């Protein structure tokens, strides 16, 4: 079975384009970006994952006490994932 990374190798490495200017993305890992608002505050993280049906975007927040990420939601659209981190 062919993985999505083999079909679209550059797709997972590019920074997702956001339609809104309220936040921007700073790379934090291979498939991970920090979501930063206009004031420079980190709202959370956006992780790109491969799904058999296409690219999915996970909105996550770092839980400092445990050192792990907490899933906020998983979306088909990067803007929807970023919007979930605004609240």
Show the residue positions of the predicted features.
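Negatively charged, low-complexity tracts enriched in Asp/Glu with abundant Ser/Thr
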Residues: 1-39, 65-70
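Well-ordered beta-strand positions in beta-sheet-rich domains
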Residues: 22, 45, 72-74
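A generic structural signal for ordered secondary structure
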Residues: 32, 46, 77-78
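Short aromatic-glycine-(Arg/Gly/Cys) micro-motifs in beta-strand/loop hairpins
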Residues: 43-68
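A short, charged, amphipathic alpha-helix used as a generic interaction element across diverse proteins
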Residues: 63-68, 73-87
